[in-house]
């Protein structure tokens, strides 16, 4: 059966890939500009705006909307307040529209719950749609390219019907979000049918939407009522929240034996580290810090990444650490008290329920994984008893590397962060578009975002000729994306880098790197026509040498060029304002 293809006859002024918070903020800035009494003819004519979203409705981290989870930032760092406090899509306006403003004030806290913030984002998404912004949900973008007229063509596929849609736009904004990063030792299991059916291996991004199915698979045929043991890989905020929620769920399941249910947090460092959210450190997330970061040398940007990494990476909010260590009840300390009492009284618990244990497996690195599918269950067949755990992890203590530990688990949850690399593959697969940026189908070992300031914007061609790069330019316009350090298992041990290369060095080893230049206002800067002509081959169409007309922007992937706040919500409002202003700026 052939796929149906539908081509839009509209030439859009702007198409956005994705409709998460970043692009909702862009849409909000456009709606505000349209409504402004100072809007000019150009902004009033800039009305054909479309966003394409893979999910069938607006969603924001549905897998991590764990009951009781709190945001880590002030409600004032919303979609618009730092850009324009008068905007209709501020968090305060949301509260007022829901008749909860006074109640929120009475809470005495500036951080909303994650559940409430997700509802706010959905409210804002509906608002911009009601005010002229079109959103096509349920379509996954599969290709982008430039056409003969210099417009950007977008190809998407309906996630339900597989119908193919094509669109054309004068401007493009790419806000890809993050895709789950899975340790290489665990990744092969993500395609195992029995694992998929039972949700016994998950990324934390899918935790809440899959955990019920996981527990159904664990308890479906456990006639022996043996205790369960679940591994949580990672040492950051998500890992701690997932571990606490697993403990709560396991504590209500009866078991038989002297040892109850357990949750093992497998972390690469010696302990859970608290996030640095002190006022002075938080200044690194201020909008004006973006200017400092962008204008700094490569050396200084690397130094700032190292200095401020404890504000966001592989760290846990102190309140959550206290929950793991001291409260609900005293968890780890209370477990030690229980052990001492049991040993003194010779108590041997043989059945019933009791609080599940959380164990911190510190300084651990995952060496290998064995999966025994005979101990898994298939929901499509007759239930069978799980006599033992399905997964065996071989762990190596980094302090005693010659000693290996084999631990059996019933399920594995990977709270190992995200990667933001998929969007660059569309440039590499394109026939024309990628070549404007020096990216061809054959690719390079790495594609690296590099800041290019107007003060340094001599002919862009000279920046692609290493012999012509002056020492002043090369100190700022140089390799920029921070690689994850360590082995392939660095993510498995809960150690995340500040960002990942746009393409993996191991994928195309031995080839030269490509610098992908970006402006202060998040616009990708193409190689000029003369340099582009040098890359043409006999197979290229004659139209490919045309100077690029469209503008392309990226959001949420420029951490090393624009600062640590770029993948977070902290500057989402001001950034949207800057992108929209640049859209209307004259060349």
UniProtKB/Swiss-Prot annotation:
GO biological process: ferrichrome biosynthetic process; intracellular iron ion homeostasis
Keyword rRNA-binding: no
Binding sites annotated in the UniProt record for NADP(+): 235-238, 312-314
Compositionally biased tracts (Polar residues): 491-505
Pathway recorded for this protein: Siderophore biosynthesis; ferrichrome biosynthesis
Cofactor binding annotation: Binds 1 FAD per subunit.
Keywords: FAD, Flavoprotein, Monooxygenase, NADP, Oxidoreductase
Location of the region described as Disordered in the Swiss-Prot/TrEMBL record: 488-511
Reported cofactor(s): FAD
Reaction catalysed by this enzyme: L-ornithine + NADPH + O2 = N(5)-hydroxy-L-ornithine + NADP(+) + H2O; L-ornithine + NADH + O2 = N(5)-hydroxy-L-ornithine + NAD(+) + H2O
Residues reported to bind substrate: 77, 282-285, 312, 570
Molecular-function GO term, any one: ornithine N5-monooxygenase activity
Protein name as it appears in the record: L-ornithine N(5)-monooxygenase
Natural source organism: Omphalotus olearius (Jack o'lantern)
């Amino acid at each position: 059966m052939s796929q149906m293809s539908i081509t839009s006859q509209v030439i859009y002024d702007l198409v956005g890939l994705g409709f998460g918070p970043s692009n909702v903020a862009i849409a909000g800035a456009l709606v505000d500009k349209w409504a402004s009494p100072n809007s000019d003819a150009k902004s009033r004519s800039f009305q054909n705006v479309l966003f394409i979203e893979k999910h069938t409705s607006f969603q924001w981290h549905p897998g991590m909307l764990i009951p009781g989870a709190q945001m880590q930032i002030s409600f004032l760092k919303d979609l618009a307040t730092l850009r324009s406090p008068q905007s209709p899509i501020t968090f305060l306006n949301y509260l007022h529209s829901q008749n909860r403003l006074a109640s929120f004030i009475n809470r005495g806290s500036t951080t909303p719950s994650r559940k409430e913030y997700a509802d706010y984002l959905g409210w804002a998404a509906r608002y911009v749609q009601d005010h002229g912004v079109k959103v096509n949900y349920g379509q996954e973008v599969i290709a982008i390219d430039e056409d003969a007229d210099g417009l950007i063509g977008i190809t998407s596929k309906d996630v339900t019907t597989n119908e193919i849609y094509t669109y054309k736009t004068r401007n493009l904004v790419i806000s890809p979000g993050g895709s789950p990063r899975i340790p290489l030792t665990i990744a092969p299991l993500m395609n195992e049918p029995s694992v998929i059916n039972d949700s016994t291996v998950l990324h934390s991004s899918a935790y809440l939407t899959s955990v019920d199915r996981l527990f159904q698979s664990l308890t479906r045929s456990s006639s022996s009522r043996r205790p369960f043991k679940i591994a949580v890989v990672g040492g950051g905020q998500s890992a701690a929240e997932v571990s606490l929620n697993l403990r709560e769920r396991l504590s209500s399941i009866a078991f038989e034996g002297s040892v109850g249910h357990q949750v093992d947090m497998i972390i690469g460092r010696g302990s859970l580290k608290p996030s640095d959210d002190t006022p002075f450190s938080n200044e690194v997330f201020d909008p004006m810090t973006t200017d400092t970061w962008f204008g700094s040398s490569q050396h200084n940007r690397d130094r700032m990444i190292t200095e401020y990494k404890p504000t966001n990476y592989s760290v846990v909010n102190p309140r959550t650490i206290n929950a793991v260590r001291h409260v609900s009840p005293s968890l780890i300390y209370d477990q030690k008290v229980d052990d001492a009492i049991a040993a003194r009284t010779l108590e041997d618990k043989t059945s019933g329920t009791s609080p599940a244990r959380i164990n911190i497996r510190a300084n651990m690195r995952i060496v290998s994984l064995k999966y025994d599918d005979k101990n898994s269950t298939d929901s499509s067949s007759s239930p069978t008893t799980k006599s033992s755990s399905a997964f065996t992890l071989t762990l190596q203590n980094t302090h005693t590397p010659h000693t290996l530990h084999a631990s059996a688990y019933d399920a594995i949850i990977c709270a190992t962060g995200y990667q933001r690399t998929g969007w660059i593959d569309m440039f590499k697969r394109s026939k024309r578009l990628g070549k404007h940026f020096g990216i061809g189908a054959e690719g390079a070992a790495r594609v690296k975002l590099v800041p290019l300031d107007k003060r340094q914007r001599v002919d862009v061609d000279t920046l692609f000729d290493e012999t012509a790069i002056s020492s002043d330019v090369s100190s700022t316009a140089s390799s920029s994306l921070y690689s994850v350090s360590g082995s392939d298992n660095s993510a498995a041990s809960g150690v995340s880098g500040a960002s990942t290369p746009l393409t993996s060095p191991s994928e195309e080893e031995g080839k030269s790197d490509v610098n992908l230049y970006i402006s202060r206002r998040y616009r990708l800067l193409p190689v000029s026509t003369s340099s582009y002509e040098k890359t043409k081959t006999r197979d290229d169409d004659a139209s490919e040498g045309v100077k690029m007309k469209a503008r392309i922007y990226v959001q949420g992937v420029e951490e090393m060029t624009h600062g640590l706040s770029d993948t977070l919500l902290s500057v989402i409002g001001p950034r949207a304002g800057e992108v929209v202003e640049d859209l209307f700026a004259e060349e």
